[in-house]
Amino acid sequence: MALNDKLDATKDKVSGKVKETTGKVTGDEKLEAKGKTEGLMGKAKEGLENIKDKASDLAEDVAEKFNDTVDSVKHKNEK
């Protein structure tokens, strides 16, 4: 996960939790709801970044296997 994106997701989760808790303690339902929403956005961003990371890892694995196959074919043709 890109560091800036990871920090942004974490910031949203923490900020959301603070707002949610503050809203609960003060009885401010709007602030509590805003905090829950912000926290969920942070979790969604984190999930999206995890998917991006896994897709990138998979693409690297496929490229590596492809290159290994090409090298193997070249090696066989050289004999």
UniProtKB/Swiss-Prot annotation:
Disulfide bonds: none annotated. Transmembrane segments: none annotated. Belongs to the UPF0337 (CsbD) family. It comes from the Bacteria. The lineage of its organism: Bacteria, Bacillati, Bacillota, Bacilli, Lactobacillales. SUPFAM superfamilies: Hypothetical protein YjbJ. It comes from Lactococcus lactis subsp. lactis (strain IL1403) (Streptococcus lactis). Residues 1-30 are annotated as: Disordered. Pfam families: CsbD. This is UPF0337 protein YhjA.
